[in-house]
């Protein structure tokens, strides 16, 4: 333990104000209305970013951008034993992938850094010293074994476990005696009865008399690392956070945080607690559900725009729910006062439809389409590799034609490399015996189709082909139009089902259609 802190533990506390004490009414008003909006997303890198975290980050981001403010990423990495390798980097990667990058962060830096709590220990020590000096905090020498016994006894009696404040009123002599044995005690904060009420921007006027239901909380552990309660207050103050938008699970802790603000003489920010994001059946999103992590969605072809759309569509904060909103539209339409206290129920079965809408919008965009072409090229190479007999299928113009023809029919780019679309990239091995028609009819139909392809001045659009293909069965005994289309679909794709034959032909182009028909005839 640092020498100044040890001296404070041995000194008689002086109950003095560290600044002006924040009154009950002041605590509800928060920062100066003219102050710049600064919000933060403060995840713990003990895991990777999931949909619940994305929603909290998104609400902070769009609130900041709507008010020309700053969005800050702060990593709460004080629980060193639970850190997951790579999680810190992945969290920031996923925010950038989602299109909501922070203005200040561990990676980007900024005027209020550092942005990892493990690098801000001196600030927490300073705040702890101030609280010890004023008598608002005290050392706790209770062993983990004793605390565990308290917990077990409470549970046995069907009571909520709480610390019994045993070390709260130790004399100076007792503190000195215990410091000789345990020079690194934990530091606890004295909970007071008079908790300031505060006006939550979602839940309204709120007050929790925490001292009546909780023991004094640890704010600084014996290893010098703070707990969440101290760290978030100190960081929000020093980072000039104007509004705290966080999950509703922290609502009951806010009174505790206001007591800390009051003891330190600091002005608290405004608070807005967001209702939980739940599964469609009302159950909690579980981190054990592997498919709720953003990396899963990114790897399986879902667009960030679709995720942002669905997690706002199922909740509140907007005048109406509608599918297909873009991020600029979310920023424009967002209204914090419209967030209700009701949990948001997320139906992930609808995500493919959301993705379909946003993929269609991107395909229709002249500026966005080249990026989709590049991604599709990578998917085709990965899926088919050496099976690609014709490298022309990787040509950007061909890829673009496929995207434009299939827009609205596919939910993800990955759909285009599924077995049903394999004919776009590889030539099927089809024998004429598989076509389900007499050999004579096959020859006639093939000859007519090849003649159609050679007809001068004929523009082979889908509309023209749909009209001309109806004529292929004319005069053929027992040959219906539907059976002819089935034959051609098999010849071109090796499949019984798929897109309309006219679209297949436009997709493949006259040269490839001719080669496939001739290949079947010669088999």
Curated annotation (Swiss-Prot):
Presequence range in chain numbering: 1-41
PROSITE patterns recorded: AA_TRNA_LIGASE_I (PS00178)
Binding site for L-glutamate: 40-42, 76, 228-232, 246
GO cellular component, one term: mitochondrial matrix
EC number, UniProt record: 6.1.1.24, 6.1.1.17
Any one biological process term the GO annotation gives: tRNA aminoacylation for mitochondrial protein translation
Gene3D superfamilies xref list: 1.10.10.350, HUPs
Keyword tRNA processing among record annotations: no
Pfam families: Anticodon_2, tRNA-synt_1c
Binding site for ATP: 50, 249, 284-288
N6-succinyllysine sites (modified residues): 256
GO molecular function: ATP binding; glutamate-tRNA ligase activity; glutamate-tRNA(Gln) ligase activity; tRNA binding; zinc ion binding
Locations listed in the record: Mitochondrion matrix
Ranges spanned by the short sequence motif 'KMSKS' region, renumbered to the chain: 284-288
InterPro entries from the UniProt entry: aa-tRNA-synth_I_cd-bd, aa-tRNA-synth_I_codon-bd_sub2, aa-tRNA-synth_I_CS, aa_tRNA-synth_I_cd-bd_sf, Glu-tRNA-ligase_bac/mito, Glu/Gln-tRNA-synth, Glu/Gln-tRNA-synth_Ib_cat-dom, GluQ/Sye
Domain of life: Eukaryota
Predominant location: mitochondrion
Motif ('HIGH' region): 45-53
Membrane-spanning residues: none
Keyword vocabulary terms for this entry: Acetylation, Aminoacyl-tRNA synthetase, ATP-binding, Ligase, Mitochondrion, Nucleotide-binding, Protein biosynthesis, RNA-binding, Transit peptide
Positions carrying N6-acetyllysine: 486
Keyword Nucleotide-binding found: yes
Stated role: Non-discriminating glutamyl-tRNA synthetase that catalyzes aminoacylation of both mitochondrial tRNA(Glu) and tRNA(Gln) and participates in RNA aminoacylation for mitochondrial protein translation. Attachs glutamate to tRNA(Glu) or tRNA(Gln) in a two-step reaction: glutamate is first activated by ATP to form Glu-AMP and then transferred to the acceptor end of tRNA(Glu) or tRNA(Gln). In vitro, cytoplasmic tRNA(Gln) is slightly glutamylated, but with low activity.
Similarity comment text for this entry: Belongs to the class-I aminoacyl-tRNA synthetase family. Glutamate--tRNA ligase type 1 subfamily.
HAMAP family in the cross-refs: Glu_tRNA_synth_type1
Protein name: Nondiscriminating glutamyl-tRNA synthetase EARS2, mitochondrial
């Amino acid at each position: 333990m640092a020498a100044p802190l040890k001296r404070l533990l041995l000194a008689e506390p002086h109950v003095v104000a560290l600044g002006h004490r924040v009154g009950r009414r002041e605590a509800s008003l928060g920062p100066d209305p003219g102050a710049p909006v600064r919000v933060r997303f403060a995840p713990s890198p003990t895991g990777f970013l999931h949909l619940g975290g994305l929603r909290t980050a998104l609400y902070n981001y769009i609130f900041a951008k709507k008010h020309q403010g700053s969005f800050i990423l702060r990593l709460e990495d004080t629980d060193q034993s639970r850190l997951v390798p790579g999680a810190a980097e992945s969290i920031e990667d996923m925010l950038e992938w989602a299109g909501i990058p922070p203005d200040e962060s561990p990676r980007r830096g900024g005027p209020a850094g550092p942005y990892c709590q493990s690098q801000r220990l001196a600030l927490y020590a300073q705040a702890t010293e101030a609280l010890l000096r004023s008598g608002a905090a005290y050392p706790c020498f209770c062993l983990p074994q004793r605390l565990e016994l308290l917990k077990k006894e409470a549970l046995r009696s069907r009571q909520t476990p709480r610390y019994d404040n045993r070390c709260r009123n130790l004399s100076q002599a007792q503190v000195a005696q215990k410091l000789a044995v345990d020079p690194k005690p934990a530091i606890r904060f004295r909970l007071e009865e008079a908790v300031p009420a505060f006006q939550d921007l979602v839940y309204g006027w709120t007050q929790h008399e925490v001292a009546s239901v909780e023991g004094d909380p640890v704010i600084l552990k014996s290893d010098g690392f703070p707990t969440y309660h101290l760290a978030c207050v100190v960081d929000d103050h020093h980072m000039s956070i104007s509004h705290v938008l966080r999950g509703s699970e922290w609502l009951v802790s806010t009174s505790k945080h206001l007591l800390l603000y009051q003891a330190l003489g600091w002005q608290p920010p405004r608070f807005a607690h967001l209702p939980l994001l739940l599964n469609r059946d009302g159950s909690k999103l579980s981190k054990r559900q592997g498919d709720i992590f953003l990396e899963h969605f990114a790897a399986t072809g879902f667009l960030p725009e679709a995720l942002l759309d669905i997690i706002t569509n199922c909740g509140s904060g907007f005048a109406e729910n509608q599918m297909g909103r873009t991020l600029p539209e979310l920023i424009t339409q967002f209204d914090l006062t419209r967030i209700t206290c009701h949990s948001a129920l997320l139906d992930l079965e609808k995500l493919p439809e959301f993705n379909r809408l946003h993929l269609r919008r991107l395909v229709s965009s002249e500026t966005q389409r080249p990026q989709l072409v590049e991604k599709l090229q990578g998917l085709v190479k990965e899926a088919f590799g050496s099976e690609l007999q014709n490298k022309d299928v990787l040509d950007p113009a061909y890829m673009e034609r496929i995207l434009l023809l299939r827009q609205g029919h596919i939910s993800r780019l990955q759909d285009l490399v599924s077995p049903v679309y394999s004919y776009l990239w590889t030539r099927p091995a089809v024998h004429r015996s598989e076509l389900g028609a007499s050999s004579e009819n096959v020859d006639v139909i093939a000859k007519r189709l090849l003649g159609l392809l050679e007809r001068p001045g004929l523009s082979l659009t889908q509309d023209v082909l749909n009209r001309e293909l109806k004529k292929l069965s004319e005069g053929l005994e027992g040959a219906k139009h539907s059976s002819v289309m089935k034959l051609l679909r098999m010849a071109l794709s090796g499949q019984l089902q798929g897109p309309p034959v006219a679209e297949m032909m436009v997709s493949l182009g006259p040269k490839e259609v001719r080669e496939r028909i001739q290949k079947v005839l010669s088999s």
